[in-house]
């Protein structure tokens, strides 16, 4: 479960988020909509580990956390699918799905597991 409470983010000219709260159960998929400047992108960047909140609490499975990087968010199971979806034209569908999260043992790709995970995602 992902639980954010009273998240606030201030930039020099604007308060982008002011006490935002959201709860997402494991396995749920949510879309965020709103007017330009409403703070959607800032909230997503905080959840994805791109930006740190100024205030508020972020819990993943009941444990307080602050993501220092997108890799930390992904490792915690928080994945952001950007609105401007960019695919690697030279990769197949499965490779695009797992891009950056390929199952590996050292430098070697575990192909059977990769195929299984990509198929499950479809």
Language model region names:
Residues 1-122:
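Glycine-rich phosphate-binding loops of nucleotide-dependent enzymes
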């Amino acid at each position: 479960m992902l639980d954010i409470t009273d998240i606030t983010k201030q930039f020099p000219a604007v308060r982008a988020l002011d006490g935002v709260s959201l709860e997402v159960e494991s396995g749920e998929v949510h879309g965020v909509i709103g007017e330009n400047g409403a703070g959607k992108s800032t909230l997503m960047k905080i959840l994805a580990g791109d930006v740190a909140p100024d205030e508020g609490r972020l819990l993943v499975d009941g444990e307080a956390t602050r993501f220092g990087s997108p890799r930390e968010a992904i490792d915690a199971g928080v994945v952001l699918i950007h609105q401007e979806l960019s695919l690697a034209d030279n990769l197949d569908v499965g490779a695009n799905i797992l891009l950056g999260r390929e199952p590996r043992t050292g430098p070697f790709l575990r192909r059977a597991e990769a195929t299984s995970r990509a198929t499950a995602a479809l």
